[in-house]
Amino acid sequence: MRKCLAAVLILTVCVFPAMTSFAWNAAGHELVDLIAYQQLTPAARLAVGELLRQHPRYEKDLLANKPEDVDAGLWAFLIAGTWPDVVRSQAHPMMQTENHSVWHYVDYPFNLGTAEGPVPEEEWVPGTDPKNLLQAMTKIQADLNDAAVKDYDKAIRLCWLEHLIGDLHQPLHTSALFSDRFPQGDRGGNSQIVQPKNGKPVNLHFYWDSAVTTDATLPAVAKLAAELTADPELSREALKDELSHGAVKDWVMESYAVCKSIVYRDGTLPSSVAPATRGVIPNGVPPLPEGYEADAAKTARRRIVLAGYRLADQINAIYK
């Protein structure tokens, strides 16, 4: 594994194109996808490479800015994992048909005091558009295993599979806090402003998006992926209990538990309420508690690695 990732690092001296990210930042999604790609079987790697070539935006999006010395299959796979964020742009020609904003999250309520948020609908009804991440994953898995679905549609679904497995391992994509301060919910941390030890105040969701790294250059991503997968505490053996749970709902509930206990600190996390005016930062934002940032970094690294292993397992199972 370490040699494979090092080879990627040696071959590449370029950066990924800049992208807007809405879950893990671009680097986080690339970490998930690179860890997964290195664990694909030869048959699965060949299959996904052929499938992604059927993507209607293969040349214009998935191979955009690909340097000559980087394998097209690897590059397309990594960019595919960020494509559901790319297609959110109003300027993208497929925005109207392939942008599904509600697919990126499923907010199970974390209720404090008398506040009570709605419980999301878990079951997807075939023939309907999924209402949340959990329903979207059911549809995506069904489509990828359905011989009647056209390859170009499956290629788009593969992009979503990569992306949503990354998303659901970001704890704030599985929960929203409801309390006297947030009677309508904190929108997965977007309504809370926190103050890191170093840097400017940011909303809680953005803080967790960037908890692993903000460097999205491929050499940096490859180096960090090698570091993470070489960590004995993040090996498949060390994570075997979590990896024994193969159901997407289990993964979501795992993230939800992490969100309650570590992200929200069981409801004790100090923060300020985000003003209604976008981009305005309130005065006097309380600092994050001692040890919070170290806990966040350690937790986020673990979530990234689990997502990578699980994505590989999903794809290997489909393309045996």
What are the functions of these language-model segments?
Residues M1-C4:
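Positively charged n-region of N-terminal signal peptides that target proteins for export
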Residues F22-L164, P171-K320:
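N-terminal, motif-rich segments that launch catalysis or mediate targeting to/interaction with membranes
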